[in-house]
């Protein structure tokens, strides 16, 4: 469902590859050698070792943890859930990172981990391979079961990492961190959720229509809509190229039904995907309606991605689309400028991206429950959004006395789906950074006195703290 849905790993939240180690805060270093951290972790029942990747300043382990398929009935069997451990020191705070998708097995650091100069545990979401039960009972893929995975891993690791813990994630990972907090509110000392959509009522999506009527400037909106329409006017010519590309590259369309249906989805993604990953300043790259078909084809592929709705492009994200069609909900929006050019009403929905042998039925109420909890009962929650990110059109809402409960929500002006605390205006950036430090229990005296003194405890590392968003095709958060 549009490249945008993709955003829900897309973000996944700007994690990169570890380079040189950062300076430690205080005397703590990665040298926890007595006993060896790997040995300590592997003594935990259910843990198994996959690999270790050496790098300066940390220990980095890829591990599996045995989890119940059904936390309500553990006797029904288990599966191996993959996670990674970026170990700095046991006397530092720990950040529990989730992308909501597959886990990146290269060393990486989320923004809160850099802020607190701590350890990071990154967990793969259940049913994303290889963390999928065999055979897969898809009815056991829901937000409570996934939150229970996190809770159980946290309980296993807490005796080793006994300082404060924070949960974080971007997009679907931000949703995941929020759901974890809703079901297990006392596990974490704080939560930082980036660009996390909140689809409270699945059939009420007028917020997206309002968003696309006002995002950016009028000239850019008009040009994007015109090019999107032109892509359908030239459908037959471009689909012919698309089919040849698919044949040459071994791509198939069994799930969506045909190359023509896949192409309609790709085009419907176009405007959403542009704003998800680009800025107002990128509007100059949008071609005119008189552009050559070669240029138009290239633009569509760069923004939406022709592989997105092939069987091969969809397969990895089947668990996401299953959840979108059974519990999370998925955005819809009107496209009056495409009137008369769309051939497949209703095709732009999660059910059409999941193999038909997997049953799906939408269950109302889950998102409303989380929304109510955030507004009424949550504590120490920080939501960070980008003003120009379509996924921010339906954000989590804060209730009464939010600041007294240390709940905050900030929007970065002009920000997209890669927005971070560092992108906020100065006073909000300082406030957010100070709160994260306090929640982690590592706020220096100067920060306790004045939020304006707050800054990350670890220096920026260009490989470890990569700024760019990991992009994915299709409408995913």
Residue ranges of predicted features:
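Conserved acidic catalytic loop of the alpha/beta-hydrolase fold
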Residues: 148-163
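N-terminal cap/lid subdomain of alpha/beta-hydrolase-fold enzymes
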Residues: 64, 70-147, 358-380, 387-390, ...
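Catalytic-loop region of hydrolases
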Residues: 2-7, 25-119, 425-430, 434-477
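A catalytic-pocket lid/entrance helix-loop region that shapes and gates access to the active site
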Residues: 187-249
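Alpha/beta-hydrolase fold active-site neighborhood
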Residues: 239-365
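Short glycine-enriched nucleophile-adjacent loop
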Residues: 174-185, 191
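Active-site-adjacent alpha-helix of alpha/beta-hydrolase-fold enzymes
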Residues: 379, 385-423
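Alpha/beta-hydrolase fold nucleophile elbow
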Residues: 161-171
């Amino acid at each position: 469902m549009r490249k945008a849905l993709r955003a829900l790993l897309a973000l996944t939240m700007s994690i990169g590859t570890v380079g040189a180690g950062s300076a430690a805060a205080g005397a703590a270093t990665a040298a926890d050698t007595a006993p060896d951290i790997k040995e300590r972790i592997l003594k935990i029942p259910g843990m198994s070792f996959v690999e270790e990747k050496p790098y300066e300043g940390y220990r980095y382990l890829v591990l599996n943890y045995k989890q119940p398929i059904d936390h309500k009935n553990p006797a029904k069997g288990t599966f191996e859930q993959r996670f990674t451990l970026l170990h700095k020191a046991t006397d530092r705070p720990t950040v529990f990172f989730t992308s909501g998708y597959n886990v990146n097995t290269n060393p990486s650091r989320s923004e809160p981990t850099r802020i607190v100069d701590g350890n990071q545990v990154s967990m793969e979401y259940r049913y994303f391979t290889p963390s999928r039960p065999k055979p897969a009972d898809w009815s056991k893929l829901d937000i409570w079961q996934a939150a229970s995975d996190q809770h159980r891993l946290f309980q296993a690791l807490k005796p080793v990492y006994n300082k404060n813990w924070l949960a974080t994630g971007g997009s679907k990972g931000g949703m995941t961190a929020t759901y974890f907090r809703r079901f297990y509110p006392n596990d974490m000392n704080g939560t930082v959720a980036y660009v996390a959509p909140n689809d409270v009522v699945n059939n009420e999506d007028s917020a997206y229509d309002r968003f696309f009527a006002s995002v950016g400037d009028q000239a850019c909106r008009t040009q994007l809509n015109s090019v999107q329409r032109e892509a359908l006017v030239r459908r037959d010519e471009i689909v012919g190229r698309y089919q040849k590309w698919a044949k040459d590259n071994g791509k198939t369309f069994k799930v969506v039904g045909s190359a023509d249906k896949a192409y309609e989805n790709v085009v419907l993604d176009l405007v959403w995907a542009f704003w998800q990953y680009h800025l107002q300043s990128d509007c100059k790259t949008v071609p005119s309606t008189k552009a050559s078909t070669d240029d138009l084809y290239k633009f569509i592929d760069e923004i939406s991605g022709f592989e997105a709705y092939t069987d091969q492009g969809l397969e990895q994200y089947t668990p996401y689309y299953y959840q979108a069609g059974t519990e999370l909900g998925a955005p819809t929006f009107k496209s009056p400028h495409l009137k008369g050019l769309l051939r497949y009403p209703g095709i732009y929905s999660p059910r059409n991206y999941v193999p038909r042998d997997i049953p799906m039925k939408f269950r109302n109420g889950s998102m409303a429950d989380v929304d109510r909890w955030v507004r009424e009962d949550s504590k120490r929650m920080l939501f960070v959004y980008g003003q120009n990110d379509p996924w921010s059109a339906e954000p989590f809402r804060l209730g009464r006395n939010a600041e007294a409960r240390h709940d905050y929500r900030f929007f970065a002006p002009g920000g997209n789906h890669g927005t971070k605390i560092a992108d906020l205006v100065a006073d909000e950036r300082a406030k957010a950074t100070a709160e994260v430090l306090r929640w982690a229990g590592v706020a220096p005296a100067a920060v306790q006195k004045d939020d304006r003194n707050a800054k990350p405890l670890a220096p920026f590392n260009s490989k470890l703290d990569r700024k760019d968003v990991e992009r994915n095709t299709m409408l995913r958060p």
